[in-house]
Structure formats: structure tokens, C-alpha cells
């Protein structure tokens, strides 16, 4: 989790030039306005016409400067039928979520320490789940209608590492021999997968 705040409010100065390791510099409260504690951004559904059939609406410190130094952030994730939030990791935060509509298969992968086990369940509207920091996880819409969930993190900037994109769309690319050895496949398979994620998409 993030460090404890040292003041009630520290509205992020996103245009500031100062370098800060944890959080952003603070705007003077006289310049912060009166809406820094409120946001309506998650009321709108995202566009799920994407390769994954999902859309993430982020509400971290970059989108909600009032969360600066408070150690929290939120996302809304919308899913088309059959849409997925592909396997990914949040390196800096634990995630807790609630399915608001539809039904999602939520999968959480333990580390080698816990036997590399997959924990999964279909989570329905009104039900919740928790994902420990740093563990790989995914969500998949198993229903016949659109679905969405709202998740919260114990960090103003939880970070995200999409596993497929990281392996096959990095810049510069991971050398193909590394991936053929690690994945135990032929070079042609790796090159095909790289072509699917070219340009970081």
C-alpha cells in the first residue's frame, strides 16, 4: 500500500514540473476548486468494441487528482458477451471488486509458493472478490449479456502488467529464442503471437 498521508488533502498538481517519488506535488487549496473529492466518471459505460471485448475506465490519481496521497483508486470494467480482461498483474496494489451487472468468471493464479494453482469462480451481480497484490488474474464474461464490475485498489497508482502484451508486444521485442525456449514452442508460433500485439495493441 501507499505511504500514509501527512495532510487531509493534497490535490495533485498534474501540470507541476517538480519530480516526486510517491505522489504528485500539491496544488494550493485555493486553486483546487470544490469538486476534487467527487467524480462521476464511472457512471458511463466504456466502449467494448475492442480486440478483448472489454473496456477499462481508470479512476486513478491521473484521472482524479483528489486521490493524491490517499492510497486509493478505482476502475470500471465493461465486458461484451465473451469479452475478457486478459491475464494481468497489479504490482503495487491489492484489488477488491464487485460485479455490478451480469456474471464474470474471475480467475486468480497463485505463485509457485502456493502450487501455481488457479482459483476461479463465476461471480454474479452483487457478489465480490479480492485479488492479492502481485498475483496474476483475469475476468471473462460467461453470460449472454453485457456485464460490468467496479474494482478498488489500495494504491493511487496500482500499475498494470498485461501478460500477453508484455510478452509479445514489448518495445524492443523480447528475442524470439528466449520465448521459444520459455514457452516450448516453435519460432513460427512466437512470431505469430508477436504479430498480434505489434504496436502495443
UniProtKB/Swiss-Prot annotation:
PTM annotation, UniProt: Glycosylated. A form called G contains antennary GlcNAc residues, whereas a form called G' lacks antennary GlcNAc residues in its otherwise identical glycans.
Record InterPro entries: Cupin_1, Germin, Germin_Mn-BS, RmlC-like_jellyroll, RmlC_Cupin_sf
Binding-site positions, oxalate: 75, 85, 90, 95
Induction statement: By salt stress.
Main subcellular localisation: secreted
Residues listed as glycosylation sites in the UniProt record: 47
First-level EC class: oxidoreductase
PROSITE patterns cross-referenced by the UniProt entry: GERMIN (PS00725)
GO MF assignments: identical protein binding; manganese ion binding; oxalate oxidase activity; superoxide dismutase activity
Annotated residues for binding of Mn(2+): 88, 90, 95, 137
Disulfide bonding pattern of the chain: 10-26
Signal sequence interval, chain numbering: none
Stretches of the chain forming a coiled coil according to its record: none
Reactions listed under catalytic activity: oxalate + O2 + 2 H(+) = H2O2 + 2 CO2
Keyword list, A-Z: Apoplast, Cell wall, Cell wall biogenesis/degradation, Disulfide bond, Glycoprotein, Manganese, Metal-binding, Oxidoreductase, Secreted, Stress response
PANTHER family named in the record: GERMIN-LIKE PROTEIN SUBFAMILY 3 MEMBER 3
Role this protein plays: Releases hydrogen peroxide in the apoplast which may be important for cross-linking reactions in the cell wall biochemistry. May play an important role in several aspects of plant growth and defense mechanisms.
Name of the protein in its database record: Oxalate oxidase 1
Species name: Hordeum vulgare
